Amino acid sequence: MKEYLDVVDENGMPTGETVERSIAHREGFPHRTSHLWLVRKRDGRIQVLLQKRAMTKSFPGCYDISSAGHIPAGQDYYPSAIRELKEELGLTAKESELIPCGDMKIVWDDVFFGIPYHDRQYTKVLLLWADIEEDQLTLQKEEVDGVLWIDLQECMDRVAAGTIQNCISPEVLKLVQAAAAATA
């Protein structure tokens, strides 16, 4: 089944045009995504849940956002984030539980499996407090190879140093850190 996305303008607002997801990435059409970060507190420190991307996905085998996804045409950020959370990790949440961290524009050019990839995302970064263990999650095997709770500051340090295989933006982690500290 083909997935269609709203093409957005320089402010991240839908233009009325839609495009198939694969074409959006091949041609670099700007579109919307949601990034939902799960956090918890352990021993007085904030931890973040990372998902390890499936080997068949873009950025194969990399640690990434707890749950993320493209916003289907005609839909909005929050319902999409909740849907992706259920699909990828088997968790449910209410929109009122999602804490906005900020908005970002992400530009990324790469090649995956021999195919050019031009990503132009307008992203809403969200946070969800989730006092759960890894074995309480139901992973979507087509998308996620595993998960890892990690101290947020350690994650930030390792991403900055390049000592963890990841596709995480350090700027996004700063947004998550600020929102987590403000709501802890």
Residue ranges and their predicted role:
Residues 11, 40-43, 54, 129-133, ...:
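Short loop segments at secondary-structure junctions
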Residues 1-44:
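Acidic, metal-coordinating catalytic segment for phosphate/diphosphate chemistry
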Residues 45, 60, 93-95, 134:
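Short secondary-structure junction motifs
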Residues 22, 61, 67, 73, ...:
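Nudix hydrolase/Nudix homology domain
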Residues 13-18, 44-52, 135-139:
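Short, well-ordered strand-loop elements centered on a beta-strand within folded domains, enriched
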Residues 75-113:
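Internal catalytic-core helix/loop-beta-alpha segment
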Residues 23-33, 45-83, 87:
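Conserved Nudix-box catalytic region and its N-terminal flanking loop in Nudix hydrolases
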